[in-house]
């Protein structure tokens, strides 16, 4: 990154994220106690749901609340939490030191499960992971909510995304040649035909910019909501009774 790139560029929007008692209470709970990997497997299940937590270790809400709201308590599922807050580029304890090691672990878990349907699901940073691993493994479909689609310094600067600066800066300080920092490029190279859903709220223009990066992929459907609660879209979908419908797709 050049010296000029370190100077934050004014954001191309004036949207504000408004916290409320309803959509922000869960943030006060300590999700740091959640393990990096939590499994709840059902023998003989045909569908395996792979969940990837965001920066605060959630899926737009606490994992169990998401499962309950989405009516998937009886499904086989594995939840992953990136304790390094590095968009899953630095691996997971006991698994390996990069995203590719996580990919190998996921492949083994999918094979062992015997599942015929696999879904990669995530919110925000977790949505980035869901798209990344779905393309990496060439299996299943991704269902994502307000995902980032790039974390490379050049594109963040050009498009005016200065969110999560401390976490992104720490990652940029140790980038390697094998890191996956631009999903448009990654999907184009690995699996341009992959199937995915991207759900995004028009109340957060930066999230919209990220979603728009994936325009042009024939099997990636971008669902834009005029309202949707901004970056808290998952909770808005839950309250609207839509979350369970989406997870059944």
Where do the language-model regions lie?
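Catalytic histidine-centered segment of alpha/beta-hydrolase-like enzymes
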Residues: 88-89, 229-239
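Short, surface-exposed "cap/lid" segments of acyl-processing enzymes
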Residues: 11-75, 79-86
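Cap/lid segment of the alpha/beta-hydrolase catalytic domain
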Residues: 81-100
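Active-site nucleophile loop of the alpha/beta-hydrolase fold
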Residues: 144-155
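Alpha/beta-hydrolase fold nucleophile elbow
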Residues: 114-124
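The feature captures the conserved acid-bearing segment of alpha/beta-hydrolase catalytic domains
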Residues: 161-224, 230-232, 241-248
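Glycine-rich nucleophile elbow surrounding the catalytic serine of serine-hydrolase chemistry
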Residues: 122-134
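Conserved acidic catalytic loop of the alpha/beta-hydrolase fold
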Residues: 101-116
